[in-house]
Amino acid sequence: MGAQETREDASGSSKKRQRPESEVAAESDAAASSTAHAEKFDELNLSSQTLKAIGKMGFTKMTQVQARTIPPLMAGRDVLGAAKTGSGKTLAFLLPAIEMLHSLKFKPRNGTGVIVITPTRELALQIFGVARELMEFHSQTFGIVIGGANRRQEAEKLAKGVNLLIATPGRLLDHLQNTKGFVFKNLKALVIDEADRILEIGFEDEMKQIIKILPNEDRQSMLFSATQTTKVEDLARISLRPGPLFINVDSEKETSTADGLEQGYVVCDSDKRFLLLFTFLKKFQNKKIIVFLSSCNSVKYYAELLNYIDLPVLELHGKQKQQKRTNTFFEFCNAERGILVCTDVAARGLDIPAVDWIIQFDPPDDPRDYIHRVGRTARGTKGKGKSLMFLTPHELGFLRYLKAAKVPLNEYEFPANKIANVQSQLEKLLKTNYELNKIAKDGYRSYLQAYASHSLKTVYQIDKLDLVKVAKSYGFPVPPKVNITIGASGKAPAAHKKRKLARD
């Protein structure tokens, strides 16, 4: 991030001194090569303020992605990075960005010099937290704009001058188009984090508009993506300068998941799924555990149920208000032990400390989602953790896809006589508790709808589900009557009608 110089005139605006390309290239290569083999942060040409902050954070040695990425970024190169979650890439892009703002002596009146775009509000808050620690001893300003937050307060802060801005795509585009006093003409660097996820959740058009609005003259850009798709390549083409440096720290590894991760699966009929989960959570309630489910309604039901039967859990899903999601996220982060029941909203990029177990209670959509889910544990260079995936007998075909994606799993077995048989109590509870019964029915319907929407139709076939057994896992002795709609037609598939999924 050192290919240009900025100086302020009397009015406080930034003026660029254009430098010959040969001078920039030579300086770039020299700077990159001088730190190319650095392993520790103090071997990089960092400011004393940044080194002090890194020391306070407890970091000394760089992860592989940091060692490969930071030197070329500090030398001004555009970077396209492929790194699995838990690799330390947040520090890899924030550190050079902060150093650049420091070296150019950015002040609030210069406006925004760096923008970091990230897919979710939780991930934005996470990056904001890291930025706050890194910038503790710097004078530059930093801020965050995310959907669900107070837009007017954000606009006021932008007008005062935010040098480093972390944002979600929709809210950023809103401010770029509508906020007077938002100075972004001096933008020097753009970071797109979790690019594949940004595109997966439907922000392709917003990203194209954002790229079009932002100044691109002499702008350094970096794009990080856990997976490389055609759409990611298209976004890279319009956002990065020609000839970016491609860094893939995972290509030489034998596995696609973290080295310190023990991974297993258990084969379990649908009617025994909750009983096994309950037994497992009871046994390990002194650990830190994340349980993934496929829908918001399923999360709401199982969280309500577990809390009701005195197994305290936290819940995190997309239907919660932003403040509730933020509070839950930080409460779980700060806890030494506990259980978080959540949807995939928490699966990407969030850095939750010291997670012992990842439980995939509902199956992931594909191997990529599996990898992102288990990326919540065994993070960093020496991280350790375990994961357990629940599969029914007819879902075992998913293991072939995981094997092809270089994911090593072992089968775990749980003795049938050790599984707590609370089925009759569960059914009795739903019979007498109207509210819980209603939430359970919503969860059951949403589970079926999510199942029918799976992309791997050869593995997840709704016709092969035993609805009586599925209903039992939600506490119903017989399947409740529900209506599910799939696709744009708004009609339930013929297979569902045959299974007598009637009106709610």
Curated annotation (Swiss-Prot):
Composition bias type Basic and acidic residues, residue spans: 1-10
Class of the enzyme per the UniProt entry, highest EC level: hydrolase
Biological-process GO terms, alphabetical: maturation of LSU-rRNA from tricistronic rRNA transcript (SSU-rRNA, 5.8S rRNA, LSU-rRNA); maturation of SSU-rRNA from tricistronic rRNA transcript (SSU-rRNA, 5.8S rRNA, LSU-rRNA); snoRNA release from pre-rRNA
Keyword check for Nucleus: yes
Function: ATP-dependent RNA helicase involved in 40S ribosomal subunit biogenesis. Required for the processing and cleavage of 35S pre-rRNA at sites A0, A1, and A2, leading to mature 18S rRNA.
Entry binding sites for ATP: A83, K84, T85, G86, S87, G88, K89, T90
Family (UniProt): Belongs to the DEAD box helicase family. DDX18/HAS1 subfamily.
CDD domains: DEADc_DDX18, SF2_C_DEAD
Start and end residues of each Helicase ATP-binding domain: 70-246
Alphabetized PROSITE patterns for the sequence: DEAD_ATP_HELICASE, HELICASE_ATP_BIND_1, HELICASE_CTER, Q_MOTIF
EC number: 3.6.4.13
Provenance organism: Eremothecium gossypii (strain ATCC 10895 / CBS 109.51 / FGSC 9923 / NRRL Y-1056) (Yeast)
SMART domains: DEXDc (SM00487), DUF4217 (SM01178), HELICc (SM00490)
Subunit note: Associates in the nucleolus with the 60S and pre-60S ribosomal subunits.
Domain notes: The Q motif is unique to and characteristic of the DEAD box family of RNA helicases and controls ATP binding and hydrolysis.
Placement of sequence motif DEAD box: 193-196
Chain intervals for the UniProt region annotation (Disordered): 1-38
Protein location: Nucleus, Nucleolus
Protein's gene: HAS1
Keyword terms, alphabetized: ATP-binding, Helicase, Hydrolase, Nucleotide-binding, Nucleus, Ribosome biogenesis, RNA-binding, rRNA processing
The protein's name in its UniProt record: ATP-dependent RNA helicase HAS1
Domain of life assignment: Eukaryota
